[in-house]
Amino acid sequence: MFEASLVLLVLVLLGWGIVSYNLLVRDRHRVAQAWSDVDVQLKRRHDLIPQLVEVVRRHAAFEQSVLENVTTLRNRGVAEASPSKLGEVETALSAGVQRLIALAEAYPDLKASRSFLDLQANLTDTENQIQYARRYYNGAVNNLNTRIETFPDLVVARLFAFRPAEYFEFEPVAAER
């Protein structure tokens, strides 16, 4: 009787360990997939910014410092891998892009340019997509981190060296209209 109870207890613990491990792996993959979605949108944004800079440069040659700042921030954003540090760069880049768009008020020919208006619409759409992807990613990070930090899953997480994921904190500057 005691041996059967012991075998049953071991089987239950083993089953729980397997289920817990599989849930942790699932959550880790969700975080990776969600980050991939964020990365796709950031790359789309990074591809649009040089086009916007070039359109503004053609119409507003005297705004060189704004153009250089946006270009520098875009290059830093492309190179950064850490979600927390990338969030800081992307927030600054968003402010720079908003300054570029605000230049249209001072240059009527730029404001009327079809390519500028198209780029502005694409950037607005991309900013919205980044926010959707960021929310999903941060939700996936929250699920994984909660599972890693709560008992009894933390036992399996520590045993298999699961690590918490970083949140992606990025708040774009609201467009001034």
Predicted features and spans:
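A helix-centric hydrophobic-segment signal that preferentially recognizes long
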Residues: F2-R177
